[in-house]
């Protein structure tokens, strides 16, 4: 008989790059989770915007089990039917002509940055290697992507970092204009900065970046790892803004619960890549592709996408009511079901404490830095689950305020 597993085992056995909650979830269904002791939680964290259809969705389980009964993996020396069907679905639903599959958002962004540099190298010469990104951005944890992310706390201990990366102020087109030049090969931007505080870009900002990229022959990369696959109420956020990138990265919700990532791009951009210029062993494996194909089928419908917008209203209305009662937040912002509650000055830096109180009350929420409580629930979360979860969140806020902010 195997030994019991406890939260303390994490501290004994794991490399300490995470500080997980004191409880261990063991079962999930829809937007509910249960821990080892049987306590129920309403899940508004969604696996950090991953569980777009909730936990253990029956049609995703069926797709996974059906493919698992056939074969799981062959490597990139062979293709497979599920990945080709998935590629066609993404192409038909977006601006893209070509797709590269991988296993995560970081890998997708790594592929995008490499493609952008190769495109510039082949078309204009090796001098055109600059990348413009934005302060407080997050693009992944590889050395290249963490350098593109504009958060020094994540990169400063890993020098020397890849060169020729500049960081402009987000939502400030004048700052971007001052840094871009003809040696810039790409601009990478999140339509909503997720880890940076749930900060939506303005339409004028993204349109301005499109114009700057066109003027300087640079590729525009939208990192839609967090905003993609219905999260904003559109299949991808670029559709909400009406600004089309040259490359788009997607992951998280694309797999529902299953690890998968993808780079979407045009025929022109893809043409610089040839056999061997990039690759991955597991990317586009049949298991991930079968699940992701079903995810797209279920999410890319008017009913689901319009439902996201309706659920946004449920959350914002209730969160504003909670805030009116307890006065914690200076702003509730975001699009669709990516929502951030910004702490006011009296409670600055204490988002983590509020999330911990929420877990005690039986609701899981995220943070986005020290000052923002973040919500990224399943896109099909029910009205009853929203009501119950936010009642628990209100109780957590009451307890947090009553015990003092220290």
Curated annotation (Swiss-Prot):
The keyword Transferase applies. Coiled coil: none annotated. SUPFAM superfamilies: PLP-dependent transferases. Pfam families: Aminotran_3 (PF00202). Keywords: Aminotransferase, Arginine metabolism, Pyridoxal phosphate, Transferase. GO terms for biological process: alpha-amino acid biosynthetic process; arginine catabolic process to glutamate; arginine catabolic process to succinate; ornithine catabolic process. GO terms for molecular function: identical protein binding; pyridoxal phosphate binding; succinylornithine transaminase activity. It comes from the Bacteria. The modification N6-(pyridoxal phosphate)lysine is found at residue 252. Signal peptide: none annotated. Its EC number is 2.6.1.81. Gene3D superfamilies: Aspartate Aminotransferase, domain 1 (3.90.1150.10), Type I PLP-dependent aspartate aminotransferase-like (Major domain) (3.40.640.10). Pathway: Amino-acid degradation; L-arginine degradation via AST pathway; L-glutamate and succinate from L-arginine: step 3/5. Its cofactor is pyridoxal 5'-phosphate. It catalyses: N(2)-succinyl-L-ornithine + 2-oxoglutarate = N-succinyl-L-glutamate 5-semialdehyde + L-glutamate. PROSITE patterns: AA_TRANSFER_CLASS_3. The keyword Nucleotide-binding does not apply. Catalyzes the transamination of N(2)-succinylornithine and alpha-ketoglutarate into N(2)-succinylglutamate semialdehyde and glutamate. Can also act as an acetylornithine aminotransferase. Belongs to the class-III pyridoxal-phosphate-dependent aminotransferase family. AstC subfamily. This is Succinylornithine transaminase.
């Amino acid at each position: 008989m195997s030994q019991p597993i406890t939260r303390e085992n994490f501290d004994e056995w794991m490399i300490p790059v995470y500080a997980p909650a004191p409880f261990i979830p063991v079962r999930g269904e829809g937007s509910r989770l249960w821990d080892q002791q049987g306590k129920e939680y309403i899940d508004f964290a969604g696996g950090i915007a991953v569980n777009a259809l909730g936990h253990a969705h029956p049609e995703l389980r069926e797709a996974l089990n059906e493919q698992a009964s056939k074969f799981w993996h062959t490597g990139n020396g062979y293709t497979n039917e599920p990945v080709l069907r998935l590629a066609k679905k993404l192409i038909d639903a977006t601006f893209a002509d070509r797709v590269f599959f991988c296993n995560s958002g970081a890998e997708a962004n790594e592929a995008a940055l490499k493609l952008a540099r190769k495109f510039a190298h082949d078309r204009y010469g090796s001098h055109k290697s600059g990348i413009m990104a934005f302060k407080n951005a997050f693009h992944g944890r590889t050395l290249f992507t963490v350098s593109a992310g504009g958060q020094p706390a994540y990169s400063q201990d890993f020098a020397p970092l890849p060169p020729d990366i500049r960081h402009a102020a987000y939502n400030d087109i004048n700052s971007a204009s001052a840094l871009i030049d003809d040696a810039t090969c790409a601009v990478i931007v999140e339509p909503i900065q997720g880890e940076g505080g749930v900060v939506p870009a303005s339409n004028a900002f993204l349109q301005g970046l499109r114009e700057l990229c066109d003027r300087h022959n640079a590729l525009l990369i939208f990192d839609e790892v967090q905003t993609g696959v219905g999260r904003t109420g559109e299949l991808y956020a670029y559709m909400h803004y009406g600004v089309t990138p040259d490359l788009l990265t997607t992951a998280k919700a694309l797999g529902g619960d299953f690890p998968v990532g993808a780079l979407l791009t045009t025929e022109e951009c893809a043409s610089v890549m040839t056999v061997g210029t990039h690759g991955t062993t597991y990317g586009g494996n049949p298991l991930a592709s079968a699940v992701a194909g079903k995810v797209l089928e279920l999410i890319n419908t008017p009913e689901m996408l319009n439902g996201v917008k309706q659920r946004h209203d449920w959350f914002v209305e209730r969160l504003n009511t909670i805030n009116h009662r307890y006065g914690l937040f200076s702003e509730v912002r975001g699009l669709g079901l990516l929502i951030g509650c910004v702490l006011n000055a009296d409670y600055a830096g204490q988002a983590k404490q509020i999330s911990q109180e929420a877990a005690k009350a039986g609701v899981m929420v995220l943070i986005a830095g020290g000052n923002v409580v973040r919500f990224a629930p399943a896109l099909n979360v029910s009205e009853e689950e929203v009501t119950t979860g936010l009642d628990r969140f209100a109780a957590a806020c009451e307890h947090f305020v009553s015990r003092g902010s220290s």
